[in-house]
């Protein structure tokens, strides 16, 4: 509990005896300040200026103090803030990565926002890839703000050369098209062997999971039949290009590979096109985007959804103000405006049509409806740090037995999620 709250409670008691006036965190004019931590580059300066002006105009009792944070070291800084006893710089609202919510919610350090989510904020329409990791122990702590997910970036000119007139909509169409593209000195697709985010989507599309949880215990699940089918498709796709089997998409950066060679496709967030064009301006007007194809043409494939949620520290002394900020930032008006400004996907499936018109964002929004996130456990960070999924992928792509390798990787995931199994 924060110092200001304790002082205010003490003053309430003193009032009964001596007429002490209540302490408050207002600015002297009856307005209370809501301190908001947002991450660098999540929103433009112009957007934040317009939002602040509108919010303070429509909330006559509140002032906004938005403080921009760096991603480097943010985990430790947030944990410190959540344990603090107070101070005027203490945040009332914090932007966090969507998969980080459980580690902050553990131990009761965040406000439970389940009631507001169900009653006021349209929880059933939220993108699952943002909503699911925002839930911990059946309570909603993270409120979806914005999303970004992978699509296929492709060379329109190479598709035309190969006689492909429209992007594929199913996995089998995708394989057929990529086989046509993978000839004549061109790579059908550049897919690094350790792109586990893409593999995750293929596994989810098959009905599999990276890990399964029950009663707070988690078990690695890469050895399920569904997960093995996802890896099998990854193998088929990956061999239709020259991606390294022992590295991820950042080693080397796939934007540079795509920009400098005859590469027909990569899997990435649409924003990478800006980097590609900076490295090779000759590709202007030659880039296209389509959702990662699904098993059937009626819906895109599942994808890993990255993005941010908004949380309220349990030690805030201005819960009402924090709720008002989240209601505005995550509401339809400003959420759609943020998506248009920053080329994001809005937090609700019903808002996808509001960002139609930009090819990359449109493809991303279509895929986001099938978006997922990593298992909602505070210990998932340990899995990403050790990352037995990457090692498993490289083994299989080098010819190892998939089922045996998957069992080994699943066993390691279980150990990392539940140290008691060691």
Tell me what each language-model feature is.
Residues 97-149, 175, 202, 288-290, ...:
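Hinge/lid segment of periplasmic solute-binding proteins
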Residues 137-145, 150, 172-220, 226, ...:
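Extracytoplasmic/periplasmic solute-binding protein
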Residues 178-179, 217-247:
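Glycine-centered hinge/linker elements that transmit conformational signals in sensory
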Residues 54, 58-126, 161-162, 169, ...:
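Extracytoplasmic "Venus flytrap"/periplasmic binding protein-like
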Residues 39, 232-318:
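Extracytoplasmic/periplasmic substrate-binding proteins
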Residues 129, 290-291, 339-387, 419-422:
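Long, aromatic- and glycine/proline-rich binding clefts that accommodate carbohydrate-like moieties
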Residues 160, 369-422:
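Conserved C-terminal helix/tail region of periplasmic/extracytoplasmic solute-binding proteins
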Residues 83, 89-92, 120-158, 187-188, ...:
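A structural signal for short loop-to-beta-strand junctions that line the ligand-binding cleft
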């Amino acid at each position: 509990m924060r110092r200001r709250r304790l002082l205010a409670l003490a003053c309430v008691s003193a009032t009964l005896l001596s007429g002490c006036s209540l302490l408050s965190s207002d600015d002297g004019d009856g307005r209370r300040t809501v301190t908001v931590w947002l991450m660098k580059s999540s929103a433009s300066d112009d957007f934040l200026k317009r939002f602040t002006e509108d919010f303070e105009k429509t909330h006559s009792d509140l002032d906004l103090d938005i403080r921009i944070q760096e991603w480097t070291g943010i985990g430790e800084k947030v944990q410190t803030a959540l344990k603090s006893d107070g101070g005027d710089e203490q945040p009332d609202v914090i932007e966090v990565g969507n998969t980080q919510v459980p580690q902050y919610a553990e131990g009761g350090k965040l406000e439970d926002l389940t009631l507001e989510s169900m009653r006021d904020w349209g929880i059933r329409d939220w993108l699952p890839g943002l909503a699911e990791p925002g839930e911990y122990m059946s309570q909603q702590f993270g409120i979806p703000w914005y999303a970004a997910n992978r699509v296929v970036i492709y060379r329109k000119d190479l598709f035309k050369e190969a006689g492909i007139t429209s992007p594929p909509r199913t996995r089998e169409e995708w394989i057929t098209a990529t086989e046509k593209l993978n000839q004549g000195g061109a790579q059908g697709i550049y897919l690094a062997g350790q792109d586990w985010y893409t593999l995750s989507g293929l596994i989810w599309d098959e009905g599999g999971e990276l890990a399964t949880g029950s009663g707070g215990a988690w078990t690695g699940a890469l050895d399920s039949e569904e997960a093995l089918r996802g890896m099998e498709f990854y193998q088929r796709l990956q061999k239709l290009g020259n991606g390294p089997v022992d590295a991820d998409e950042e080693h080397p950066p796939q934007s540079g590979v795509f920009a400098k060679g005859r590469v027909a496709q990569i899997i990435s967030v649409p924003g990478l096109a800006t980097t590609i064009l900076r490295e090779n301006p000759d590709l202007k007007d030659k880039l296209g985007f389509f959702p990662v194809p699904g098993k059937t043409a009626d819906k895109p494939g599942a994808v890993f959804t990255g993005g941010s949620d908004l949380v309220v520290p349990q030690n805030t002394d201005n819960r009402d103000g924090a709720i008002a900020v989240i209601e505005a930032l995550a509401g339809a008006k400003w959420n759609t405006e943020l998506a248009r400004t920053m080329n994001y996907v809005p937090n609700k499936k019903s808002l996808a049509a509001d960002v139609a018109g930009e090819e990359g964002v449109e493809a991303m929004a279509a895929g986001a409806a099938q978006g997922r996130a990593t298992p909602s456990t505070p210990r998932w960070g340990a899995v990403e740090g050790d990352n037995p999924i990457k090692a498993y992928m490289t083994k299989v792509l080098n010819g190892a037995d998939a089922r045996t390798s998957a069992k080994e990787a699943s066993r390691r995931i279980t150990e990392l999620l539940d140290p008691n199994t060691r």
